[in-house]
A protein has these predicted regions:
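Nucleic-acid endonuclease domains
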Residues: 1-43, 50-245
């Protein structure tokens, strides 16, 4: 993320009193918002975005993982002036998962067919294909698996794939190695099915102009919390809502 974008998004987090993760280590979560409603505490994951234009950038290589995550997030978007030295915040939008769904669904529609093809094609790989790619062996080593699937698995996952014992040593069976080959094929195909930085469109964002989704100062945090609270009350079973206590 460019330094300027990161600084603006940190500013938004402070204004809206969000819990910011500077390393984005919560599985790609920018921040979280905790709210109390009727003696219960709830948590919403927040996607924090900023823009100096009329659209909003998202991410590189957007695939189905992004789609699934976005459907469980509150979007807080700050729109800034285009001044080179110090862009000033003009206005903000706070959009719920249901607000974002039409745009998210439009992105899903663009990539879904390719992701289905990736899944179906990988399932058709058989042992003959494994032998052609990795050589014909009775069993395979972790090193063989790493050459195939590279850094897509952790050391623990590679160790767990050793499903066969020969003497005192563990190996990977042909069946398990074929599964790894299928996973690798699916991963490669899915990489080609992603979209590069699809923008949240002006047409979608304009539908919220003049509504209560526009957050104004000076009580920025209160505005976001009201939108979040109304969302939880209206959609108590939504997957985005996490009950803390």
């Amino acid at each position: 993320m460019p330094v300027q974008d990161d600084e603006r998004e940190r500013e938004l987090v402070r204004m809206f009193n969000l819990d910011w993760d500077p390393a984005h280590q919560r599985a790609g979560v920018d921040a979280v918002l905790d709210i109390d409603i009727d003696d219960h505490s709830y948590r919403l994951e927040v996607e924090v975005k900023s823009s100096t234009g009329t659209t909003v950038s998202t991410a590189r290589d957007v695939g189905m993982d992004h789609i699934q995550k976005w459907r469980r997030k509150l979007f807080v978007i700050g729109f800034y002036s285009k001044e080179a030295r110090r862009p000033e915040l003009q206005h903000c939008l706070c959009l719920t998962p249901t607000d974002m769904e039409p745009w998210i669904a439009s992105i899903e529609e663009k990539i879904l067919i390719d992701f289905k093809l990736a899944r179906l094609a990988s399932r058709r790989l058989v042992l003959k294909d494994l032998f052609e790619v990795c050589g014909k062996k009775d069993t395979y080593s972790v090193e063989d698996a790493k050459r195939l699937h590279k850094q897509q698995w952790t050391a623990e996952e590679y160790a767990a794939a050793q499903d066969t014992m020969i003497g005192t040593k563990r190996w990977i069976s042909q069946k398990k190695m074929l599964e790894i080959l299928q996973l690798r094929s699916k991963y490669i195909a899915e990489r080609g099915a992603t979209l590069n930085n699809p923008h949240v469109t002006k047409a979608h964002l304009d539908t919220f102009v003049g509504t209560d989704r526009v957050v104004k100062g000076p009580n920025w945090a209160a505005g976001v919390r009201k939108i979040a609270t109304d969302f939880v009350r209206s959609n108590p079973d939504h997957a985005a809502i996490m009950l803390i206590s």
